[in-house]
């Protein structure tokens, strides 16, 4: 116990498509989950979303670190339309904005565990061969259930989206520093002074701690942002998703109709923070 309060909020009301599907099996792997008095159950199982989360925000008792686990319909995993995830993000922000005293000291980090395809023109950083702690070297790993038989470097991988939304990161702006999922742990390490012991020196040298996503040199902009829900045009994708949901599986989808004619996409631009940006 490092003295940093935390909770995991998850949806429990949608049966098989609630957060239990994506999170429940992970928690029950720990023996503490069988004890209703344990901190794991009190803070990692009992809290619900949106009820407990909204109540804690309104009462100004949100813990210092919170995780919100979406239900399957909000996860943007095929065959669910990506617009459903956008609705979920807006709903979380609306809950936070309901209490300005909470919002002015809160940062919402929206993270993804996978990219949207199998191609990235940017080659990820890879640790030199033999770097301790950065290579899987277990013999006969293909005999380990669920391992996929992969031996070699542990990341980095294809790029995935990440949004940092707070009064200190108003933009929109883009940060070009290199982060990975452990960067969120590094941010907590920097903010609360609790060391993360399981990160190698190589990973620390390659990835940042996400402090560069904030600008503390200017007063916070805690005004109400534009939170319009995704346009109704996004619902046009739903008919395309129904066959996948009904006939496909979570790993094997039905091909979508290829638009015709096709045009080359236009690369979007946005203001960027300096490189390296670091804490302001």
Curated annotation (Swiss-Prot):
Entry-linked InterPro entries: Alkaline_phosphatase_core_sf (IPR017850), Phosphoesterase (IPR007312)
Coiled-coil ranges from the UniProt annotation: none
GO biological process: lipid catabolic process; symbiont-mediated disruption of host cellular anatomical structure
Subcellular location: Secreted, Cell wall
Organism field: Mycobacterium tuberculosis (strain ATCC 25618 / H37Rv)
pH-activity dependence text: Optimum pH is 7.5.
Keyword Electron transport on entry: no
Catalytic activity: a 1,2-diacyl-sn-glycero-3-phosphocholine + H2O = phosphocholine + a 1,2-diacyl-sn-glycerol + H(+); 1,2-dihexadecanoyl-sn-glycero-3-phosphocholine + H2O = 1,2-dihexadecanoyl-sn-glycerol + phosphocholine + H(+)
Protein name: Phospholipase C D
The organism's place on the tree of life at top rank: Bacteria
GO molecular function, one term: phosphatidylcholine phospholipase C activity
Keyword field: Cell wall, Hydrolase, Secreted, Virulence
Broad EC category: hydrolase
Its biological purpose: Involved in virulence. Induces cytotoxic effects on mouse macrophage cell lines, via direct or indirect enzymatic hydrolysis of cell membrane phospholipids. Hydrolyzes phosphatidylcholine. Does not have hemolytic activity.
Span list, region Disordered: 258-280
Family: Belongs to the bacterial phospholipase C family.
